[in-house]
């Protein structure tokens, strides 16, 4: 380019990007998680709304967060998304993995057999499992265990399949893998050597 002259390059249209986020729902979730986290005295909180039939993320809110137009007003810790870059424990959603494994490999149905489970039990390897509420010993069907979200009962159902089967189902359900391809997204970790029949999801 000769000094003092101009060089013109016509713009090229970019691609089309369409978010799955519902803006109204996103705004509401953002307000809700901020209010609830502060009301509970929590250091932070996240909430994700996923459309079950498609897997589309309709809202992904967290607190504390930052204003991209005013980074100086926020802590560097808020400059990334904890929703995608921090690993988290699957919790009671993990019970679906256990249920699928025993139904397809151990002949378990929603109504038979039953397992005897109290709200607090110690397993053979020393692990102690508790339910969220205190209750006497119940004879749980798989359906009942899922309805009550019983950690103890689901752990007992989980002993009906081998560690190899459990590990296979973890992989088939995508546990320990990235999801949406977000920059720096973590995949989490699933250790086969530490896989135990009574894990309910809190220890992964």
Ranges and model annotations:
Residues 2-5, 21, 51-92, 97-202:
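Beta-lactam-recognizing serine transpeptidase/beta-lactamase-like catalytic domain environment
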Residues 1-43, 66-69, 77-78:
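Extracytoplasmic/periplasmic proteins that interact with beta-lactams or build/remodel peptidoglycan
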């Amino acid at each position: 380019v000769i000094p003092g002259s101009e060089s013109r390059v016509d713009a090229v249209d970019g691609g089309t990007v369409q978010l799955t986020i519902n803006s109204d729902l996103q705004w509401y979730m953002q307000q809700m998680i901020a209010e609830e986290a502060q009301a509970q005295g929590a250091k932070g909180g996240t909430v994700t709304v996923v459309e079950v039939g498609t897997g589309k993320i309709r809202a992904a809110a967290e607190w504390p967060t930052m204003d991209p137009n005013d980074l100086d007003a926020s802590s560097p810790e808020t400059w990334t998304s904890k929703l995608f870059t921090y690993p988290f424990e699957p919790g009671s959603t993990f019970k679906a993995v256990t249920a699928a494994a025993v139904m397809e490999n151990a002949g378990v149905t929603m109504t038979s057999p039953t397992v005897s489970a109290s709200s607090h039990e110690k397993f053979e390897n020393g692990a102690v499992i508790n339910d969220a509420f205190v209750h006497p010993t119940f004879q749980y069907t798989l359906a009942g265990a899922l309805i009550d979200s019983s950690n103890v009962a689901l752990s007992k159902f989980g002993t009906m399949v081998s560690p190899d089967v459990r590990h296979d189902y973890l992989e088939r359900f995508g546990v320990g893998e990235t999801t949406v391809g977000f920059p720096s997204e973590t995949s989490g970790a699933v250790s086969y050597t530490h896989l135990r029949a009574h894990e309910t999801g809190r220890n992964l």
